[in-house]
Amino acid sequence: MDLLVMLLSLLVSYLIFKIWKRIDSKRDQNCYILDYQCHKPSDDRMVNTQFSGDIILRNKHLRLNEYKFLLKAIVSSGIGEQTYAPRLFFEGREQRPTLQDGLSEMEEFYIDTIEKVLKRNKISPSEIDILVVNVSMLNSTPSLSARIINHYKMREDIKVFNLTAMGCSASVISIDIVKNIFKTYKNKLALVVTSESLSPNWYSGNNRSMILANCLFRSGGCAVLLTNKRSLSRRAMFKLRCLVRTHHGARDDSFNACVQKEDELGHIGVHLDKTLPKAATRAFIDNLKVITPKILPVTELLRFMLCLLLKKLRSSPSKGSTNVTQAAPKAGVKAGINFKTGIDHFCIHTGGKAVIDAIGYSLDLNEYDLEPARMTLHRFGNTSASSLWYVLGYMEAKKRLKRGDRVFMISFGAGFKCNSCVWEVVRDLNVGEAVGNVWNHCINQYPPKSILNPFFEKYGWIHEEEDPDTFKMPEGFM
């Protein structure tokens, strides 16, 4: 009898040990953001209204209609007066870039951000175990990741990933790589470096589908410090709750929606196809289908299913009736999902005013929810994959982020991709702590009373019909 009791005790103890071991291992797989640092280029790289007009005029391939199209795009873009461009633009060499221009642009960015984020957290470059670099439009040899390792003399056994051509959704992809490595290796520190090189990618042709990219993209970048160390969890800012990636590259129309190619004259640029909005919508819907059950409470999912059922019943034609319109659904039944039941803040990619408006409409968001994305677009423009971190920085600077809040990051990229993730705020974040917040110098000015682009006043003539043969540039334009 005693032997049986002893065996049962050993069995129970073994089961408890295995359960505890599994739970304990899961705890070490958590992905935390310790800190992040967005890049603010120097003021001598600031782009204002007059300078934007000067750059446009330097392109001798543009005709009147292309000038007007380009200026209209800038007017309606939601971009303000204080965004940044690469140095060669101010030297008048945007149509004659060199490889060194792109490398210097990236070096200026990563030295600024990496040094600040490591110094602030008292971490040596040699302590970094994982390095993920994503810059879509610059592919050098050695790689940018190798240049960072060389500059900071990092360890020989560092795990390195250099991502290119992943588009504006590359930040979330980089986080996914780190998350998966954290599942295998314990007690690690990771550094994600995200930016875009504009220097070698200015389009100097006149194809409308390709000059649009010149209007939207601006210089920027971010370095993000992550860990799965349990000992550092109390210092962390955010904890990753879930991440979903959607890729529609198998569909030809989605694949061709955003493509780098040559135009008829041989000028290389990024072609934005008219199918882009539809491709983005499809990818967004498919992404939401997967992530929604992971982030919303069961009560909201049940409410949504009940609303759909009621809507379907009301729209069904009655027996013996052949007129479907007689069974039209009545007003008052809301079938949309309320994402605010599980999400507190929405971190939206600043791909443009239309992108922000479309996501806001789809998720039934108000102006308070969209303010961080709109203000980021206005102040920094579309900084590609790093734009999400500027939006997050705005929320932090405005003291919106409280312990337990959940932040929904949504990004889009060529391919076509939609990637999203949800972060939980681990502790209250106050701007007093974040001495390196890129918004600290100007947050009191936002939101401004108006974000009307000065082009609207200065270049109002672009909305007038003109004869290209008799048209003369207005006085003061040049």
Swiss-Prot record:
The keyword Transferase applies. Pathway: Lipid metabolism; fatty acid biosynthesis. InterPro entries: 3-ktacl-CoA_syn, ACP_syn_III_C, FAE1_typ3_polyketide_synth, Thiolase-like. GO terms for cellular component: endoplasmic reticulum; membrane. GO terms for molecular function: fatty acid elongase activity. Pfam families: ACP_syn_III_C, FAE1_CUT1_RppA. Expressed in siliques, leaves, stems and seedlings. Induction: Repressed by herbicides such as flufenacet and benfuresate. Down-regulated by darkness and low temperature, and up-regulated by salt, drought and osmotic stress. The active site is at residues 168, 247, 345, 349, 378, 382. Keywords: Acyltransferase, Endoplasmic reticulum, Signal, Transferase. It catalyses: a very-long-chain acyl-CoA + malonyl-CoA + H(+) = a very-long-chain 3-oxoacyl-CoA + CO2 + CoA. It is found in: Endoplasmic reticulum. The keyword Nucleotide-binding does not apply. GO terms for biological process: fatty acid biosynthetic process; response to cold; response to light stimulus. Residues 1-25 form the signal peptide. Belongs to the thiolase-like superfamily. Chalcone/stilbene synthases family. This is 3-ketoacyl-CoA synthase 3.
